[in-house]
């Protein structure tokens, strides 16, 4: 069975494939008993484990059931988390919440919010042969038809992610003389890359990674904090679903960093991939083409609900382009009209430079796919990384090619990707600093751009995962 997770997440110290299962077998600490402690492990035909002592006595060893958080804290393969993910974060869970709302007494319902990514919207637009704006309106119509209360666009949250990434880079560039780990800055929006970095390279790589939250998790802050306040609700009274182009986003939403201890709720309760939304449509017997469009929802009255918006710089969010333009202007007073990409090893590794009088002032790169990520990390370890900033994504070709996107059976992969890029770029673009509602929220919700509150709600932290010494680390 092929894993839907990104290549970076399928890495493991085992050479054989561990298929997903409900009960992952994890080493369990057993209290030492007096004696020599010499024993053998016998594996039965049914897969159960027995300890065989020297005197011939046998003892069945424990089989530990692990949660998704256990899997995230493990240093090995994460494919065994797949079934847990599918049961905890699936369209069936959304159905349960919607059904519970129908049965609930007045005032006991949870407010259901769905936030849709631009990449998922482009994928569904391609499948149903619609333009992105019609797709957004018809998706709003569909979700409200099945009981969802509000449908938002995560592009609004991406404004904050981009702005925080811009500010962080400029700050770290200015600090590079005082810190060896200030540069390069590595983008943080891809959870597959983050999970791989934490598990495989740990404390070496983590200081380089941007602390800016991804658009999904900024949306989590917006919905469970700002929007909850607007609706006079506590965060646990809102059920927040995101629609994303990859399965790795389920792992991101499940991180303890994005869990509200006071209200015992996650910023994002459920992540659906584009494919899961398509299955939901099929199960409801609905085609997007047949639905009447509905008005789009805006998080604030100043956010346009007429049409969706996006950003320049490609289908992975435009991190390189926005940080590059801002840094050129802020650090060197240079206005960049067009960003020119120079392909290097392959189309997924490209470079951008800012030069003045023959001197390179800034050198940025995009590194998509695990092969290029490995090369980047090796350069860093050898002290030969020439870049100031790198937009890193685990999926080859970036987020439009995420593992949760719809595949076209009659279309070549490259042809479908070109179609998605065209649809993605059809949407109106805006600079994040000029987006309606953004500055208003910085002042009134976050209490200023550089406030402690802005840092807490728009940034995160990373955790190196220690590799335990166990039999599971044996290479076969």
Curated annotation (Swiss-Prot):
A Pfam family reported for this protein in Swiss-Prot or TrEMBL: Fe_hyd_lg_C
GO MF terms, alphabetically ordered: 4 iron, 4 sulfur cluster binding; metal ion binding
Its biological purpose: Component of the cytosolic iron-sulfur protein assembly (CIA) complex, a multiprotein complex that mediates the incorporation of iron-sulfur cluster into extramitochondrial Fe/S proteins. Seems to negatively regulate the level of HIF1A expression, although this effect could be indirect.
Record SMART domains: Fe_hyd_SSU (SM00902)
Protein name: Cytosolic iron-sulfur assembly component 3
Sequence positions bearing N-acetylalanine: 2
Family: Belongs to the NARF family.
GO cellular component assignments: cytosolic [4Fe-4S] assembly targeting complex
Binding annotation for [4Fe-4S] cluster 2: 190, 246, 395, 399
Region described as Disordered: 297-316
Originating organism: Mus musculus
Oligomeric and partner information: External component of the CIA complex. In the CIA complex, interacts directly with CIAO1 and MMS19.
Amino-acid positions noted as binding [4Fe-4S] cluster 1 in the UniProt annotation, renumbered to this chain: 24, 71, 74, 77
Lineage: Eukaryota, Metazoa, Chordata, Craniata, Vertebrata
Gene Ontology process terms (BP): hematopoietic progenitor cell differentiation; intracellular oxygen homeostasis; iron-sulfur cluster assembly; regulation of gene expression; response to hypoxia
Alphabetized UniProt keyword annotations: 4Fe-4S, Acetylation, Iron, Iron-sulfur, Metal-binding
């Amino acid at each position: 069975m092929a894993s839907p997770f990104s290549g970076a997440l399928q890495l493991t110290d085992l050479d054989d494939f561990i298929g997903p299962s409900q009960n992952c077998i994890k080493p369990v600490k057993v209290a030492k008993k007096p004696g020599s402690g010499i024993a053998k492990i016998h594996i039965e035909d049914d897969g159960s484990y027995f300890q065989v002592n020297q005197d011939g006595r046998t003892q069945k060893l424990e089989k530990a059931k692990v949660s998704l958080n256990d899997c995230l804290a493990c240093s090995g393969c994460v494919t065994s988390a797949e079934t847990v993910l599918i049961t905890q974060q699936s369209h069936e869970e959304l159905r349960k919440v919607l059904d519970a709302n129908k049965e609930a007494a007045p005032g006991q319902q949870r407010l259901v919010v769905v936030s849709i990514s631009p990449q998922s919207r482009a994928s569904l637009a391609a499948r149903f042969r619609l333009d992105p704006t019609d797709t957004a309106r018809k998706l709003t119509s569909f979700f409200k038809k099945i009981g969802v209360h509000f449908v938002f666009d995560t592009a609004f949250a991406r404004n904050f992610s981009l702005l925080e990434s811009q500010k962080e880079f400029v700050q770290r560039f200015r600090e590079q003389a005082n810190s060896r780990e200030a540069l390069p800055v590595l983008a943080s929006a891809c959870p597959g890359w983050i999970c791989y970095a934490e598990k495989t390279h740990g404390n070496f790589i983590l200081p380089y990674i941007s602390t800016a939250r991804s658009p999904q998790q900024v949306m989590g802050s917006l919905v469970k904090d700002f929007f909850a306040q607007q609706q006079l609700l506590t965060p646990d009274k809102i059920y927040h679903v995101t629609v994303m182009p990859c399965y790795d986003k389920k792992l991101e939403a499940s991180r303890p960093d994005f869990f509200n201890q006071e209200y015992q709720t996650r910023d994002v309760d459920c992540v659906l991939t584009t494919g899961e939304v398509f299955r939901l449509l099929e199960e409801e017997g609905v085609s997007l083409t047949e639905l009447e469009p509905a008005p789009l929802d805006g998080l604030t009255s100043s956010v346009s609900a007429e049409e969706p918006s996006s950003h320049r710089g490609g289908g992975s969010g435009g991190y390189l382009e926005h940080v590059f333009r801002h840094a050129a202007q802020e650090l060197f007073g240079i206005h960049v009209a067009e960003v020119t990409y120079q392909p290097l090893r392959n189309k997924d590794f490209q470079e951008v430079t800012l030069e003045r009088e023959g001197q390179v002032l800034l050198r940025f790169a995009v590194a998509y796919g695990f092969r290029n990520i490995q090369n980047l990390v090796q350069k860093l370890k050898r002290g030969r990384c020439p870049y100031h900033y790198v937009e890193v994504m685990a999926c080859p070709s970036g987020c439009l090619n995420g593992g949760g996107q719809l595949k076209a059976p009659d279309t070549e992969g490259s042809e479908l990707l070109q179609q998605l890029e065209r649809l993605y770029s059809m949407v109106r673009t805006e600079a994040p600093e000029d987006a309606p509602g953004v500055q208003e929220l910085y002042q009134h919700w976050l209490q200023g751009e550089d406030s402690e509150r802005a840092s807490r709600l728009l940034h995160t932290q990373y955790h190196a995962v220690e590799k335990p010494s166990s039999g599971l680390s044996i290479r076969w």
